[in-house]
Design a protein with these regions (language model features):
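Acidic carboxylate motifs that coordinate Ca2+ or other divalent cations, activating on Asp/Glu
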Residues: 99
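Short amphipathic beta-strand segments in non-cytosolic proteins
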Residues: 47-52, 56-67
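Primarily secretory-pathway and cell-envelope proteins
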Residues: 21-52, 102-149
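Bacterial Sec-dependent N-terminal signal peptides
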Residues: 1-29
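A short tyrosine-centered beta-strand micro-motif
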Residues: 86-92
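Short proline/glycine- and polar residue-rich coil/turn motifs
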Residues: 68-74, 136
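Short, flexible loop/turn segments at beta-strand junctions in immunoglobulin-like
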Residues: 80-83
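Surface-exposed loop/turn motifs at beta-strand-loop junctions within extracellular Ig-like
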Residues: 94-96, 148
Length: 149
Protein backbone atom coordinates (compact mmCIF):
# COMPACT_ATOMS: atom_id res chain seq x y z
CA UNK A 1 0.00 0.00 0.00
CA UNK A 2 2.84 2.42 0.83
CA UNK A 3 4.40 1.65 -2.53
CA UNK A 4 1.18 2.60 -4.35
CA UNK A 5 0.94 5.87 -2.40
CA UNK A 6 4.58 6.73 -3.26
CA UNK A 7 3.96 6.03 -6.95
CA UNK A 8 0.77 8.10 -6.87
CA UNK A 9 2.58 11.04 -5.18
CA UNK A 10 5.42 10.85 -7.70
CA UNK A 11 2.99 10.90 -10.62
CA UNK A 12 1.12 13.81 -9.07
CA UNK A 13 4.34 15.81 -8.69
CA UNK A 14 5.31 15.11 -12.31
CA UNK A 15 1.89 16.20 -13.59
CA UNK A 16 1.95 19.39 -11.52
CA UNK A 17 5.48 20.31 -12.59
CA UNK A 18 4.78 19.68 -16.24
CA UNK A 19 1.61 21.77 -16.23
CA UNK A 20 2.91 24.73 -14.19
CA UNK A 21 6.69 24.80 -14.09
CA UNK A 22 7.56 24.04 -17.67
CA UNK A 23 5.07 26.08 -19.65
CA UNK A 24 6.29 27.16 -23.04
CA UNK A 25 7.12 30.87 -23.22
CA UNK A 26 4.68 32.80 -25.39
CA UNK A 27 6.21 34.31 -28.48
CA UNK A 28 4.89 36.80 -30.97
CA UNK A 29 5.60 38.18 -34.41
CA UNK A 30 6.34 41.70 -35.61
CA UNK A 31 5.56 42.69 -39.19
CA UNK A 32 7.34 45.80 -40.47
CA UNK A 33 6.28 47.71 -43.59
CA UNK A 34 8.17 50.44 -45.42
CA UNK A 35 6.93 52.21 -48.53
CA UNK A 36 7.79 55.26 -50.62
CA UNK A 37 11.27 53.95 -51.43
CA UNK A 38 12.77 56.22 -54.08
CA UNK A 39 13.62 53.31 -56.39
CA UNK A 40 13.64 49.51 -56.53
CA UNK A 41 17.43 49.13 -56.49
CA UNK A 42 18.98 46.80 -53.94
CA UNK A 43 17.19 45.54 -50.85
CA UNK A 44 15.96 46.82 -47.50
CA UNK A 45 17.83 45.80 -44.35
CA UNK A 46 15.55 45.55 -41.30
CA UNK A 47 17.50 45.50 -38.01
CA UNK A 48 15.65 44.76 -34.76
CA UNK A 49 17.09 45.87 -31.42
CA UNK A 50 16.06 44.86 -27.91
CA UNK A 51 18.74 46.47 -25.71
CA UNK A 52 19.14 50.06 -24.52
CA UNK A 53 22.90 50.03 -25.27
CA UNK A 54 22.48 48.85 -28.88
CA UNK A 55 21.86 52.31 -30.36
CA UNK A 56 23.43 54.03 -32.15
CA UNK A 57 24.58 51.16 -34.37
CA UNK A 58 26.17 52.78 -37.41
CA UNK A 59 27.86 49.54 -38.54
CA UNK A 60 24.84 47.22 -38.15
CA UNK A 61 26.51 44.89 -35.63
CA UNK A 62 24.53 45.28 -32.37
CA UNK A 63 21.14 44.10 -33.59
CA UNK A 64 19.07 41.32 -32.01
CA UNK A 65 17.78 40.05 -35.36
CA UNK A 66 18.19 41.23 -38.93
CA UNK A 67 16.16 40.43 -42.04
CA UNK A 68 16.54 41.46 -45.67
CA UNK A 69 13.47 42.43 -47.63
CA UNK A 70 12.95 42.47 -51.38
CA UNK A 71 11.60 45.66 -52.91
CA UNK A 72 8.36 45.38 -54.86
CA UNK A 73 6.73 48.51 -56.30
CA UNK A 74 8.69 50.81 -53.99
CA UNK A 75 7.82 48.92 -50.81
CA UNK A 76 9.13 46.10 -48.63
CA UNK A 77 7.71 44.02 -45.78
CA UNK A 78 9.27 41.49 -43.42
CA UNK A 79 8.04 39.59 -40.37
CA UNK A 80 10.20 38.84 -37.34
CA UNK A 81 8.97 35.56 -35.83
CA UNK A 82 9.31 33.92 -32.40
CA UNK A 83 9.98 37.13 -30.48
CA UNK A 84 9.60 37.27 -26.73
CA UNK A 85 7.26 40.01 -25.58
CA UNK A 86 9.17 43.20 -24.83
CA UNK A 87 10.45 46.55 -26.08
CA UNK A 88 12.04 46.83 -29.52
CA UNK A 89 13.42 49.34 -32.01
CA UNK A 90 13.38 48.83 -35.79
CA UNK A 91 16.07 50.42 -37.95
CA UNK A 92 15.81 50.19 -41.73
CA UNK A 93 18.30 50.85 -44.49
CA UNK A 94 17.43 51.11 -48.18
CA UNK A 95 20.63 49.36 -49.22
CA UNK A 96 20.62 50.52 -52.84
CA UNK A 97 24.06 49.08 -53.65
CA UNK A 98 23.50 45.84 -51.67
CA UNK A 99 26.72 46.09 -49.67
CA UNK A 100 25.10 45.78 -46.23
CA UNK A 101 26.47 49.15 -45.09
CA UNK A 102 25.23 52.73 -45.01
CA UNK A 103 26.69 54.61 -47.96
CA UNK A 104 27.71 58.05 -46.71
CA UNK A 105 28.42 61.44 -48.16
CA UNK A 106 30.69 63.72 -46.17
CA UNK A 107 28.56 63.34 -43.03
CA UNK A 108 25.03 62.27 -43.93
CA UNK A 109 23.87 58.96 -45.40
CA UNK A 110 23.26 58.82 -49.16
CA UNK A 111 20.90 55.86 -48.81
CA UNK A 112 17.51 55.96 -47.13
CA UNK A 113 17.26 55.16 -43.42
CA UNK A 114 14.45 55.00 -40.91
CA UNK A 115 13.66 54.21 -37.29
CA UNK A 116 10.49 53.22 -35.53
CA UNK A 117 8.68 56.27 -34.09
CA UNK A 118 10.72 58.75 -36.18
CA UNK A 119 9.38 61.01 -38.92
CA UNK A 120 12.66 62.87 -39.43
CA UNK A 121 16.29 62.45 -38.45
CA UNK A 122 18.97 65.11 -38.09
CA UNK A 123 22.08 65.99 -36.15
CA UNK A 124 19.95 67.28 -33.27
CA UNK A 125 17.32 64.54 -33.64
CA UNK A 126 19.27 61.30 -33.42
CA UNK A 127 17.42 58.11 -32.50
CA UNK A 128 17.98 56.53 -29.09
CA UNK A 129 16.47 53.34 -27.76
CA UNK A 130 14.14 55.20 -25.42
CA UNK A 131 12.85 57.52 -28.19
CA UNK A 132 12.49 54.85 -30.90
CA UNK A 133 11.31 51.87 -28.85
CA UNK A 134 7.81 50.45 -28.72
CA UNK A 135 6.16 47.57 -26.88
CA UNK A 136 5.36 44.23 -28.47
CA UNK A 137 2.89 42.52 -26.11
CA UNK A 138 1.68 40.15 -28.83
CA UNK A 139 1.58 39.97 -32.63
CA UNK A 140 2.01 43.47 -34.02
CA UNK A 141 2.34 45.32 -37.34
CA UNK A 142 4.11 48.68 -37.73
CA UNK A 143 5.10 51.05 -40.51
CA UNK A 144 8.52 52.71 -40.57
CA UNK A 145 9.05 55.86 -42.63
CA UNK A 146 12.03 55.97 -44.97
CA UNK A 147 14.05 59.18 -44.81
CA UNK A 148 16.45 60.35 -47.52
CA UNK A 149 18.80 63.11 -46.35
Amino acid sequence: MNKIIKIFKSLLVIVLLSSFGFQKQETCSLTVDVSELRNSKGTVQFALYNREDALPDEHYKKYFKKLTGKIVNGASTVTFENLPEGKYVVNILHDENNDGKIKRGIILPKEGIGFSNFQSIGISNRPTFSKASFSVPGDKKIKVNIIYL
